[in-house]
Amino acid sequence: GSNIKVSCFVDSGVPVLNGSNLEGFSLSEKTFRYVTREKADSLNKANAHRGDIVITHRGTLGQIVFIPQDSKYDRYVISQSQFRVRCNDKVLPEYLVYYFHTPIGQHKLLSNASQVGVPALARPSSTFQQIEVVLPELSIQKRVVEIISTIQKKIVNNQELNDNLYAQAKAIFDNHFINIDAIPAG
């Protein structure tokens, strides 16, 4: 990850990822802080791109997301609490992210965690590289990713629908019970 000082942040540029951007399986692009392209270039080892995996190694352990091909930006800078993983051609990054969200995957990911002070993974990159994962052939990985991503999309759509319904119910409630002028006399 990177060690970015507060004075380096600007209003627009290359987004910096932190723990709040690592929700569930995928990258949350709701809010960002930014650094200039020049600063991002100087932090080349802390740059993550579409197709990369980002893992939190200090703080909220167990966070692991995939940067999708249709992400808002083509490049991100990871904070000092994360590290980046690039997969070889034997594994789909989405499959690996799904795997590390299973109880077995979380156990393997967190087996070297220190709980003294701020939770952290010891030597995160080298420890991660030593984790053994039995991988099915690519065709099976693709099928697993298709099934889980279809379910994930339905979950997101349902959440958006629920949020919309909640906003409508709140507006009706506010209009009828809080806005006294809207209540007919009598």
Predicted regions located by residue number:
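Short, Lys/Arg- and Gly-enriched loop/turn segments at beta-strand edges
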Residues: 61-68
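A short glycine-rich beta-alpha junction/loop motif
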Residues: 75-83, 114-145
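Sequence-specific dsDNA recognition surfaces
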Residues: 1-7, 20-53
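Amphipathic alpha-helical segments that form coiled-coils or helix-hairpins used
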Residues: 1-13, 49, 130, 134-137, ...
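Short peripheral tails and domain-boundary helices/loops at the edges of structured domains
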Residues: 72-95
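Amphipathic alpha-helical segments
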Residues: 94-96, 126-173
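Glycine- and charge-enriched low-complexity intrinsically disordered segments
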Residues: 90-111
